[in-house]
Amino acid sequence: MKVFCGMLIAAATIAAAPMALAQAPASGTAYVVTYIEILPSAQGEAAGLLKQVAAASRKEAGNQRFDILQRIDRKNQFAILEAWTDLKAAEAHAAGAALKQFKDKLKPIQASFYDERPSKGIAVAPSPSSVGRNAVFAITHVDVTPPNTDGCIAMLKKLADDTRKETKSEQFEAWQQNNRANHFTVTEIWKDRAAIDSHVMAAATKDFREKLGPMSGALYDERLYKSL
């Protein structure tokens, strides 16, 4: 019986791996945000591996975006922002050799698990063709209690509309996590650090955060990055 139960658990673990992508809509752009934490002594090695997988991934069929980012205040933390034309393209990438080789090489220097969050877009916009060297990326994980999911979506869409009117906003998007509908990722690109500091003080931003507070299921987790 113990052997049989062990086999069931192993099978469930294997089956769970593609579930997050499988729960995404079959049509429409597929998005993925990945958080990576590396041993502090291995920052340079990780940056090199990220550049390699980015170069390979951008050549794959259906890739629309593959941004590799390094956190400004904790340089051993990285993020990947991906967009694929549809679920099929995202699944092909997830099962492909380039990503597998990247994960295999990354594993020995990881300080935490490979935190990959497939998502769908709820407030999206075209990516800029290029960004300046002073550009700052912000990624925020927003978690609300399940009854507040629809309200949060409406608020995120309004914040996106308001933010895109700011002169130094280069992109603002909100994604909804496939396997947890009450979890969201906000991705932003700003011309420079002063621009995002100004955005934080904007009336629309303060109004959003004030209203989000009572709805939240976790801390408002905003992280700032530079492009590699």
Q: Where are the predicted features?
A:
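Short amphipathic alpha-helical segments
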Residues: A42-Q64, A98-Q101, P146-E170, A204-F208
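Structured core of small recognition/catalytic domains
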Residues: D150-L228
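Bacterial N-terminal signal peptides that target proteins for export
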Residues: M1-I9
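Short, well-ordered beta-strand segments in beta-rich or mixed alpha/beta enzyme
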Residues: A30-E37, D67-A94, N134-D143, E173-V200
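Glycine-rich beta-strand-turn "strand-cap" elements at beta-sheet edges
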Residues: L21-A30, D67-N76, Q101-F137, Q171-R180, ...
